């Protein structure tokens, strides 16, 4: 179908890491493409389905500039000056400045810098700075795998997200530039880094004018799930609701708000109720189906010893109440905090999945200890 039907036009930037910021891109290196069967194979499927949903609802064409680069950590996309002004990130800048790249991985929140593209600001300089201050309506972001793999420390990722969003808003001269991102999906049981990184992404929502598409229910053995439709369309709910006046649209699934201890139980409150909570299931790219006779899964509680135990969970009105016979004095609760939780089934009635969460970040493992083999 042509862009007159889908309403989508695309533009991809050339790949080349540069140390100083590029100020212009040669005309022959970049051009808008009308959506067609021939142009889609080389373009981001998530971006396409995002743009198509927005265009279909607004009735106007939507253009997307793709500035992605697969398999790269977030550091390369952040303006280098943002590292200098943030306490949590300054050690990275100092080591890179002194050409001690191998030592970056040993830092709290460290990352393996495999090539120059992973150095602070390098991808930003070549693929973001040349576009600014183009009058973009917002940004969508799908990344995190390369900050949560073997040898990477996902702690501090939320501070990197803050630096990313703030830096882009500065260069686009828009302090309220909407920024929507994808939370990492389900992947592998041993992917402890992904557990912590998903939580870091959830905590990044403290930034104003941001939104997160939850994908924990889109299980796939591939690091990049084949179901791009749900990812893109869930992202599209955010601008439709927050920017384009579709206030009746629910833009996200249930997000952890607070937890209250009541004797041997914990009562959990959520934002983004979307008409109420429900137990449901989703098979592949099919619709979400309510399953009221099924128990809620993947809730766990812990006492002061920080040992997690499976918990029974029940929906009571707009809250979830959890308890476990193994924990008489609970202090923390978590949901879907595994590398690949099978059938996480808490949704709102808009058909959107609840985000994984942990009420106490100190209790959440982030890697396998190389000495003991346990988690840390």
Annotate each language-model stretch with its function.
Residues 80-104:
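Acidic, His- and aromatic-enriched active-site or binding-groove loops in soluble protein domains
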Residues 267, 273-376:
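C-terminal beta-sandwich/jelly-roll accessory domains of carbohydrate-active enzymes
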Residues 1-11:
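Single conserved hydrophobic/aromatic residue that forms the stacking wall/gate
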Residues 65, 184-216, 228:
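Substrate-gating cap/lid alpha-helix
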Residues 230, 241-290:
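Surface beta-strand/loop "capping" patches
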Residues 25-66, 71-73, 78:
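A conserved hydrophobic secondary-structure block that centers on an alpha-helix together
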Residues 48, 118-130, 159-167, 192-202:
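Alpha-helical scaffolding within the catalytic cores
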Residues 8, 58-63, 134-138, 174-180, ...:
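Loop/turn elements at helix/coil->beta-strand transitions in domains of secreted/extracellular proteins
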């Amino acid at each position: 179908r042509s862009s007159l039907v889908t309403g989508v036009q695309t533009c991809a930037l050339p790949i080349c890491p540069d140390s100083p910021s590029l100020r212009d891109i040669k005309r022959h290196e970049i051009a808008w493409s009308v959506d067609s069967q021939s142009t889609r194979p080389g373009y981001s499927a998530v971006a396409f389905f995002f743009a198509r949903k927005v265009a279909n609802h607004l009735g106007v064409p939507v253009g997307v500039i793709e500035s992605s680069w697969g398999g790269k950590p977030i550091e390369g996309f952040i303006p280098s000056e943002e590292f200098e002004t943030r306490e949590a990130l300054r050690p990275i800048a100092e080591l890179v400045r002194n050409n001690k790249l191998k030592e970056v991985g040993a830092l709290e929140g460290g990352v393996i810098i495999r090539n120059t593209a992973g150095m602070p600001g390098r991808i930003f300089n070549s693929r973001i700075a040349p576009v600014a201050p183009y009058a973009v309506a917002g940004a969508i972001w799908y990344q995190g795998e390369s900050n949560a793999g073997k040898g990477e420390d996902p702690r501090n990722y939320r501070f990197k997200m803050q630096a990313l969003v703030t830096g882009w808003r500065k260069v686009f001269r828009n302090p309220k530039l909407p920024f929507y991102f994808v939370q990492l999906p389900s992947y592998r049981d041993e992917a402890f880094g992904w557990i912590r990184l998903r939580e870091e992404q959830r905590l990044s929502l403290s930034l104003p004018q941001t939104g997160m598409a939850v994908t924990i229910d889109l299980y796939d053995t591939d690091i990049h799930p084949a179901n791009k439709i749900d990812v893109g369309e869930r992202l599209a709910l955010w601008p439709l609701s927050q920017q384009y006046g579709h206030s009746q649209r629910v833009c996200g699934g249930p997000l952890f708000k607070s937890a209250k201890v009541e004797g041997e139980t914990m009562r959990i409150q959520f934002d983004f109720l979307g008409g109420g909570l429900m137990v449901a299931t989703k098979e592949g790219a099919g619709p979400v189906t309510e399953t009221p006779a099924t128990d809620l899964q993947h809730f766990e509680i812990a006492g002061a010893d920080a040992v997690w135990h499976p918990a029974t969970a029940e929906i009571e009105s707009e809250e979830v109440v959890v308890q476990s016979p193994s924990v008489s004095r609970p202090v923390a609760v978590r949901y879907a905090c595994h590398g690949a939780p099978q059938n996480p089934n808490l949704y709102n009635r808009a058909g959107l999945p609840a985000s994984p969460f942990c009420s106490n970040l100190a209790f959440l493992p982030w890697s396998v200890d190389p000495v003991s083999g346990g988690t840390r």
